[in-house]
Design a protein with these regions (language model features):
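N-terminal subdomain of nucleotide-sugar transferases
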Residues: 1-43, 48-51
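A short, basic/aromatic alpha-helical/loop segment that forms part
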Residues: 14, 173-175, 195-200, 213-214
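Membrane-proximal helix-turn-helix segments that form the acceptor-binding/catalytic region
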Residues: 100, 113, 126-144
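A short, charged, and often flexible helix/loop element on the N-terminal side
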Residues: 45-76, 80-89, 119-126
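Acidic anion/phosphate-binding donor-loop and adjacent secondary structure
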Residues: 156, 168-185
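Conserved donor-binding/catalytic core segment of Leloir-type glycosyltransferases
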Residues: 2-4, 145, 180-209, 219-220
Length: 224
């Protein structure tokens, strides 16, 4: 089986989606022929067991992006195209180009269709994007991939596409160095972007409730 992933960036600074495609590409590449279409950046992550193709950035006034992606589709002839990310015209156009060739498309929004995201810049950015390309992209995808049950339920509430599968994110355990010392320390680590969406409010509330039991513990919050 031949699979093409499209993702806007695999740069180290791009966050969780870059790490996701790095882990996925390494393991999926052992089972299928995997190609990744993306855009050049200063610090791209290395991804094993797959071929990376850099294309021009999307520009509605130029045709280089469309020409390059179409050429890759013609040469590679994939069985499946997997689009990662949304709210970017390039993602929708990759999907359109694939489906014009009757190639099945999986669409993974990576949490970018959560209610709180949609509400941000709703009238100035989200509504125009939905009307121009994003709504049709969601409706026409052969399958939507959610990473958790809560995300699936929010996608169902949108009412655009009910064919949703949950595929949870994995980690590359081989790259994790084991601790040499297991000395117990009274320390809790919250490692994430500092935002209510990441559940930091639950940690704060729980710590307050368990204040007496947590005497002597240190809570470390690390993230943007």
């Amino acid at each position: 089986m031949k699979i093409i992933h499209y993702i806007p960036s695999i740069d180290r600074t791009a966050g969780g989606t870059s790490t996701y495609i790095q882990v996925l590409g390494k393991e999926l590449g052992k089972l299928a022929e995997v190609h990744i279409i993306t855009h050049a950046s200063e610090n791209p992550l290395p991804i094993d067991n797959c071929k990376i193709h850099y294309v021009s950035g999307y520009n509605p006034l130029k045709g280089s992006f469309k020409i390059e992606v179409n050429k890759l589709f013609d040469v590679l002839k994939p069985d499946l195209v997997h689009v990662n990310c949304c709210w970017m015209p390039a993602c929708a156009f990759v999907q359109q180009m694939a489906q014009k060739r009757n190639i099945k498309v999986v669409f993974t929004p990576h949490g970018m269709l959560e209610p709180w995201i949609i509400k941000r810049h709703y009238w100035t950015r989200k509504v125009p994007a939905l009307l121009l390309y994003q709504k049709s992209a969601i409706k026409n995808a052969d399958c939507l991939q959610a990473t958790a049950e809560s995300e699936k339920q929010n996608l169902l509430k949108l009412g655009y596409n009910s064919n949703i599968k949950i595929v949870k994110l994995g980690i590359d355990a081989e790259s994790i160095a084991m601790k040499t010392s297991w000395k117990k320390s009274k320390q809790m680590l919250f490692l994430s972007r500092v935002h209510i969406k990441k559940g930091i409010n639950y940690l704060i509330e729980a710590a307050d409730i368990l204040r007496d039991e947590l005497q002597g513990y240190k809570i470390v919050v690390a993230g943007e």
